Regions:
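Catalytic cores of secreted/periplasmic lytic hydrolases that degrade extracellular macromolecules
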Residues: 1-115, 122, 127-214
């Protein structure tokens, strides 16, 4: 009886040890799985961050020229673009800063260079947006029967401006397409001999704000 009892104890002890070993291996496997998952998440996060960096450029690399393609965006992130608008000293009414999100999103939607779009609005409406343009929400002097077309809101006015530029002036086959440069847009948008210099001058003022962003 004693032998059997001891044997039973031995068997039980051996069994308990086996259970403990299995449990230990299970915990180790669980830890390894969690570590693998953490590494995969970290790798995915790193990849996403790399993509964001690749898609956006430093403010130091933003450039403009008179013969630039106006359908090529600046490459700035929205955050940096808003900083640029905040640093735009000519924007005393804060129209450009307050509408920076809308302007940025519309330029993305309609493939328009942000600096050109701001420069054009300023050239046509003034940095502080003249009363007739502010009242009609018409920021690039779109006309009908010799009068500024009236839009219902700032958002609609900006959207129509971007849409018309894209469809009519900056897209091959568009109604008023003459090229993707300032000189090309000028042919039908405003034949005035000083228009290119006016718009580019306003764009240059925006560039001064770009250089202030750290």
């Amino acid at each position: 009886m004693i032998y059997n009892r001891n044997k039973k104890v031995t068997i039980t002890t051996s069994y308990t040890r086996s259970i403990a070993q299995v449990s230990s291996r299970g915990e180790e496997t669980s830890r390894q799985t969690k570590n693998t998952e953490k590494k995969q998440k970290a790798k995915t996060k790193s990849t996403n961050n790399t993509k964001k960096t690749e898609n956006n450029i430093s403010v130091n690399n933003v450039k403009i020229s008179k013969n630039m393609d106006l359908t090529v965006r600046t490459g700035l992130s929205k955050e940096d673009f808003k900083k640029v608008m905040k640093n735009l000293s000519q924007d005393t009414s804060k129209f450009f800063y307050n509408n920076a999100d809308t302007i940025y999103d519309l330029c993305a939607k309609y493939q328009i260079n942000e600096i050109f779009f701001c420069g054009l609005i300023s050239a046509e409406s003034g940095w502080n947006i003249a009363g007739n343009h502010r009242k009609t929400h018409n920021y690039i002097s779109l006309m009908s029967k010799g009068k500024l077309i009236h839009y219902s809101s700032t958002e609609q006015g900006l959207e129509v401006a971007a849409q018309k530029l894209h469809n009519n002036y900056l897209t091959p086959g568009g109604k008023f397409y003459g090229g993707k440069t300032l000189a090309g847009v000028k042919k039908k948008f405003c034949p005035s001999g000083t228009w290119v210099d006016l718009v580019y001058g306003r764009m240059s003022q925006v560039m001064k704000a770009v250089k202030k962003v750290q």
